[in-house]
Amino acid sequence: MADLEEQLSDEEKVRIAAKFIIHAPPGEFNEVFNDVRLLLNNDNLLREGAAHAFAQYNLDQFTPVKIEGYEDQVLITEHGDLGNGKFLDPKNRICFKFDHLRKEATDPRPCEVENAVESWRTSVETALRAYVKEHYPNGVCTVYGKKIDGQQTIIACIESHQFQAKNFWNGRWRSEWKFTITPSTTQVVGILKIQVHYYEDGNVQLVSHKDIQDSLAVSNEVQTAKEFIKIVEAAENEYQTAISENYQTMSDTTFKALRRQLPVTRTKIDWNKILSYKIGKEMQNA
């Protein structure tokens, strides 16, 4: 181990540490960070060299943050990234600083938004918030309106998580939806992501995603928002159902084919009484 440490440069150590951090399961950033910190044993090197990994993790995970003085949480995403550690809260029309390590928002200030898209953005946000409230007990959504390549574009992001460290599991749902405002019809593009980590008596991760494309009829703001939500609801319901059915099938067939639930003796070993078993006596006499 000592020889390996001598061979690794600081740059290589930071690169490895950053990979661990970026791939930390939902709700386990602090645990992974603390473990990496112990392994690296150089706080300055970690903070300076892996700062990009802290930011990338929060952007990828759609980390929700509460801004003091404002009721609703906002998501940290690439679409709200204004650079230099500042982010946009489009609902409240404010910009704020975000500490990627502490996950804290500070210094909220008024911020300009894309006025040409704002009425569309507001309509979609109102409809999406009602949908999220109905389907996600802990859900947070942020809707952006901006011009991309000259086209008025709506981007809707949803995040919902359950962190159950006491029960040895954590999970997060993320979805991102995008469409341009064009006459008659437009194309809706979405991506749905699920990540779950279960680590009681084992270590299992579910990482899944699905790409979505659908056509959206464009009329006025309110009606278009309603039609958009229908697409979102149908796709997310179908995805969740498919995931549940797939893993139930795997549990009933594939997993059972891979390994017996009980050993050949049809009884589980009580490891606290191992010495009373014949194998325990044999091990003791070995």
UniProtKB/Swiss-Prot annotation:
It comes from the Eukaryota. Coiled coil: none annotated. F-actin-capping proteins bind in a Ca(2+)-independent manner to the fast growing ends of actin filaments (barbed end) thereby blocking the exchange of subunits at these ends. Unlike other capping proteins (such as gelsolin and severin), these proteins do not sever actin filaments. The gene is CAPZA2. One of its GO terms (biological process) is actin cytoskeleton organization. Keywords: Acetylation, Actin capping, Actin-binding, Phosphoprotein. The modification Phosphoserine is found at residue 9. This is F-actin-capping protein subunit alpha-2. The modification N-acetylalanine is found at residue 2. PROSITE patterns: F_ACTIN_CAPPING_A_1, F_ACTIN_CAPPING_A_2. Belongs to the F-actin-capping protein alpha subunit family. GO terms for molecular function: actin filament binding. Component of the F-actin capping complex, composed of a heterodimer of an alpha and a beta subunit. Component of the WASH complex, composed of F-actin-capping protein subunit alpha (CAPZA1, CAPZA2 or CAPZA3), F-actin-capping protein subunit beta (CAPZB), WASHC1, WASHC2, WASHC3, WASHC4 and WASHC5. Interacts with RCSD1/CAPZIP. One of its GO terms (cellular component) is F-actin capping protein complex. The keyword Cytoplasm does not apply. The keyword Signal does not apply.
